[in-house]
Amino acid sequence: MNRVLTFITFVIFIGANCSSAADNGFGSGQLQDERQIDSTMADTVTVKEKPKGLINKIIAYFNESNKVRRNKKFDFSIIGGPHYSSDTKFGIGVVGSGLYRPSASDSVSPLSNVSVYADATTSMFFKLGVRGTHIFPNDKARLNYDINVAQIATKFWGIGYEMARNDDNESKYKYFTSQTEVSYVWRLAPNFYIGPMATVDYINARDMAKPELWEGERDKTFNIGVGLTMQYDNRDFLTNASRGMYARLDQRFNPRFLANKYAFSLTELYLAYYHPVWKSATIALQLHSRLTYGNTPWGLLSTLGGSDNMRGYF
């Protein structure tokens, strides 16, 4: 079982608000009329000055990236930043996010979203992926997807608690993984969805310093899973919620008749609650449980932590 150290990402956001003021004067005759016309035009037309200098342009870009432009058919923005963790060392991550509405006549349903992300570090770690939620007209159904590939040079102590607590078992190896998770859910009641899901996982351990720690298990595993997912979602915004609740219960099966070398099942529960405290501040609570049973391959055993779990939300 891998020991997971806290992954800390430092992202610096710089914000600036720009405002402009117009002076309205009152005179007599033609000058007064011209100023009244200018005042009327100032009330109806806003001229935004282009930022000058590289720093101001970067600040303006970050400010605009946080705004939802509902008049655009596809609102896409890119953001990136440096990070550091004890496992992967220094790196740079980039995310391109898009918001769109499949039907122009549907102005009530939440916006669909898609994100393309990439990360690379000095320790030869990399991760590439795409994920998102496509919301069908009137929110009658949703398609959720997450596809990614990653490689990391990390450490291994063995399978199970007793082996992992022995520091003498520490060994290095390279871990490559490819994961695909897709679900299609129908809305059965307000904010309640249910539907099938499928997963495909490929895991490959390479350059193992102590292969005996795997206790004869395959260094390469390929698993296909199918199951059912139930979701409750009344968040105000899917990708950056400030209020509401999201609950998801997944039950997956990886049987042998799907060509799996390891047959096992998985139950996963995810709860998240968001409550606004004051402007731009939100308290968020998260509960995550992942249980596997059966002949679970070493690479799909549950771990503590991970980059997908919340540590702070402000």
Residues covered by each model-derived region:
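Cleavable N-terminal export/targeting peptides
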Residues: M1-I55, F62
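Interface/linker segment at the passenger-translocator junction
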Residues: V47-N56, A60-R69, F74-H83
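Gram-negative/organellar outer-membrane beta-barrel architecture
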Residues: V68-S77, H83-D219
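Transmembrane beta-strands of outer-membrane beta-barrel proteins
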Residues: F76-I78, S112-V116, A141-I147, I194-P196, ...
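Noncatalytic linker/hinge segments flanking ATPase motor cores
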Residues: A118-K127, K155-E162, S183-P190, N223, ...
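C-terminal outer-membrane beta-barrel translocator/porin domains of Gram-negative envelope proteins
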Residues: G227, Q231, R235-F314
